[in-house]
A protein has these predicted regions:
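Structural signal for interior beta-strand "rungs" in well-ordered beta-sheet cores
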Residues: 1-187
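Terminal amphipathic alpha-helical/low-complexity segments used for targeting or macromolecular assembly
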Residues: 1-5, 10-11, 16-17, 53, ...
Length: 261
């Protein structure tokens, strides 16, 4: 069902059961998957592919040119998976040639009011961005992460799986998987124990992660502490996720406790 006040380019690919409310504008390069609902006043442009069962609320803008002065009109795209909810005034920009030309969001994500996802970002699945989270260019947010309201995330930063970032945090450094990070400039303050329990990770593994945290992040020179870990701790699959995250990308520093270097 398409409201007669909406403007749909004839070259757009719209599944038969998509609902498009009043005053929406859909460009020629847009694909909308089955059972997706657009409430009203939504602008989707560019080469934008949106999957199934998404719900998009009023005044959302997706696929308009990236806010990057280096962007010169090169081809780019935005790819969004299934079962996402984008609340009012969410803005998602496509990629640039400096970042692979693609912005990607996975499945089952909730982006609350006024969230911005900049060019070349890569967001996984089951992520929650609370109201007014501002995600800079080239940012990676892994599965099941939660970012509190009014956070600003510096370009090229990474937030690991099942991490929790407290509200109004300025994220300048990478947040480890399962980490809890907050503050004016994000400091690591512990593990996201609530998230770990909700994910049904065993008490044994949670205790081992706590021991890992106390060994690595409660003493100076955390990288040397990792090298000196006992073999059985390094082999734990959750510890390995954190170590691989730390070793995989060094564009931004790792978020650490305030007194650790």
């Amino acid at each position: 069902m398409i409201h007669p006040s909406s403007i749909i380019d004839p070259n757009a690919k719209i599944s038969n059961d998509v609902v498009i409310g009043p005053y929406c504008v859909i460009g020629p390069g847009v694909e909308l998957g089955s059972n997706t609902k657009l409430h009203s006043h939504i602008n989707i442009k560019g080469t934008t592919k949106i999957g199934k069962n998404n719900e998009i609320f009023p005044f959302v803008s997706i696929g308009t040119p990236p806010q990057d002065l280096k962007y010169k009109g090169e081809k780019n795209s935005t790819i969004i998976g299934d079962n996402n909810k984008f609340r009012e005034y969410v803005n998602i920009n496509p990629g640039t040639s400096q970042g692979g030309t693609i912005t990607k969001l996975g499945n089952n994500n909730l982006l609350m009011v006024y969230c911005h996802v900049a060019h070349d970002c890569n967001l996984g699945d089951n992520i929650v961005l609370a109201n007014n989270v501002q995600v800079g260019g080239h940012v990676t947010i892994e599965n099941n992460a939660i970012v509190g309201g009014s956070c600003a995330i510096h370009q090229f930063s990474r937030i690991g799986s099942l991490a929790l970032v407290g509200g109004m945090t300025g994220v300048l450094s990478d947040v480890i998987p399962f980490g809890l990070s907050l503050g004016n400039r994000n400091n690591l303050v512990g593990l996201n124990l609530v998230g770990l329990r909700r994910a049904k990770i065993s008490n044994k593994d949670i205790k081992l992660l706590q021991n890992f945290y106390n060994i690595v992040f409660c003493n100076q020179n955390f990288r040397s502490n990792i090298e000196n870990l006992e073999a059985d701790m390094k082999e734990n699959k959750y510890v390995k996720i954190i170590i691989d995250f730390i070793n995989s990308d060094k564009k931004r520093p790792i978020s650490l406790p305030e007194n650790i270097k």
